[in-house]
């Protein structure tokens, strides 16, 4: 069917067609190989932007550090990181003047959070740099390893389970002359396989103790590991992102909590809200500017882009901001919050895996680890890499590069938003003291600036003043990439505004389709995504109906569950045909069992099992929802599950969907190949951790789940809980006397074992 594409747009306003220009169909690009080159680019660029700052040497680690703060004022339009302390402090003071009590109240809220946060807050998040093993690990494992090492080195504050006490341990650990850690290593040896009589390589995993002196420990504690950012659309070059270690994370969390509390009270901040709430907030600012620009005034909006936001921000500036924001607060609070920026101004960037070399002629491959880059002969590298290495060499220590200026991606999003908003705040007439004034929106490094003035010259003057003010605090608006329009049309954080926000539907495209969790969850997630897009993203009824049909088709191909009466032959068709023939009420079969689809756009909110329950044969119901079915590893039945859906940009979103556990809710088994690698020890630790947590939650079901307060350990808490429950059960006649006695005996045995240990 030939369609002239222009016909599709005849009835569509131009702004609604914007989504067709987005690069969001198909697979996003992933990075392969090492991120070392990208990291070196980041380090070198960051130093270049601050090159006229002062060099000093860190007395503890010996790392050379560049400090651009209060450096020369820029004379051209090149990006630079020379923020002026007094300007930043003044911007903060004016922000407080416009919002009386904002800092005071945010500090009080944050203090409350600090008192209550448990150390398990740090188990959230994905990959974390594990300083004990010198590589990335899941957050929970990295935390467990850190606590284990702290404990074996005599640091015990964290036993209480409060995050603030764990942070006390971190501070104390930095004063220790040495730290003893346990590292994993693997031995390879060649042995003869008894079955095949061939020689095979056998790997064994060992744990060994290692001592780190103060300098080595500090370097590791201040290290951010780097990786390449994956799945970034619309970019030609990849870039590096950082994962901090456990020593830094807790401090960053508290600073961001404070900044988040401030952002919530600022009408120009696009964080921490999202979705429709964010759109409403933004629409308010635009409305204010348009109503206030009387008939005599012009109003223009800049869709802004900042050059290398992170690399021109400076942790020393953040320290100044925090010092000002917390100025009337208790000493302990000020100290806790100032540690994150101090650690960041002494941070080290780990260069990743290093480079892979291969010789085609000799069929040889060799890995050059990052640690060797300081000493290796540069003749092996190509021109561009050679330049990078030469530039970074003075900064290298043990395979990490000293990186004092700059922030690395995504570390202080909230706090840097506060800085951006403080400049937008200066646009009020009482501060500009002239005929032009401005306002706008800021969300991390993205901004929209609305300027009002009586004439075009006034608009130009306002933009120039904004541009220069930004320069003073290390923000570099890009003149090449920002563009200006009559107010009413602009883009901000991929929301397109044209007299109201236009749905940018293409952004949601990647989340349509079959997730690949299991038959039950996939069906549920698929229809929920369509339902949500009808609510939030202008997905019209006809398109939604089509999306639904495409989804069902996709689903059937994925799980090979075509209708029982189909001609399509797959591995499953024989079984499904048999089921189809022996089913009396065919309308009751689930799609995944070869049934037909009952969904339409009116009933997307009903789980498929519920939709078809009344139509099912009785024996089919019995097989489908049978908790004793031995082939299904059942999770406990929750009424609502969370799926991770990938929007086109921004982090993966969590989306709720209704979950009805059936024999289709299977959990796939883990890949076995991990068991032969050095990860095996870690996997065992992880399973152990998981088992302990599961056991603990059996004793404290969520309804009565109060975290044990005070110093009792998990075991003590469980034993005392078991005793209480047993006594209640015995007195109410739910258990016999013998059972009660047996429980008491087990509890005593456990306590005895703990005492002996």
From Swiss-Prot:
Its main location: host cell. It is found in: Host nucleus; Host cytoplasm. PROSITE patterns: RDRP_SSRNA_NEG_SEG. Phosphorylated by host PRKCA. The lineage of its organism: Viruses, Riboviria, Orthornavirae, Negarnaviricota, Polyploviricotina. Signal peptide: none annotated. Residues 55-64 have a biased composition (Polar residues). This is RNA-directed RNA polymerase catalytic subunit. One of its GO terms (cellular component) is host cell cytoplasm.
